From Swiss-Prot:
Protein name: Integration host factor subunit beta
One Pfam family cited in the UniProt record for this chain: Bac_DNA_binding
Gene this chain is encoded by: ihfB
The protein's assembly and partners: Heterodimer of an alpha and a beta chain.
Any GO CC annotation of this UniProt entry: chromosome
Length: 102
């Protein structure tokens, strides 16, 4: 699912909302999650999951094209940990109908 499909879904589930309002709502949620992560905060959405920022230390790696050693700088990366409800639903769906296109 891409962002525009999510906006369309929110608009369809809430017929009193115009598509533009649904888009603004989705943008506001995503902007706030991003802002919280930028501030180093943990975003915990009950029964859905948790967004956190993790530190990746600097390390050496290899260029896959030529095998030369390269230095990879440290960085901060977003990480999502799915909540129990999502994990349970995915595992129930897997048992009943397979994983679809995974």
């Amino acid at each position: 699912m891409i962002k525009s499909e999510l906006v369309d879904f929110v608009a369809a589930k809430n017929p009193y909302l115009h598509r533009r309002d649904a888009e603004n709502a989705v943008d506001a949620v995503l902007d706030e999650i991003t802002g919280a992560l930028e501030r180093g905060e943990r975003v915990d959405i009950r029964s859905f999951g948790t967004f956190v920022v993790r530190h990746r230390p600097a390390r050496s790696g290899r260029n896959p094209l030529n095998g030369n050693a390269v230095f990879i700088e440290e960085k901060w990366v977003p990480f999502f940990r799915a909540g129990k409800e999502i994990r349970d639903r995915l595992n129930t769906a897997e048992k009943s109908q397979g994983r679809g296109n995974l």
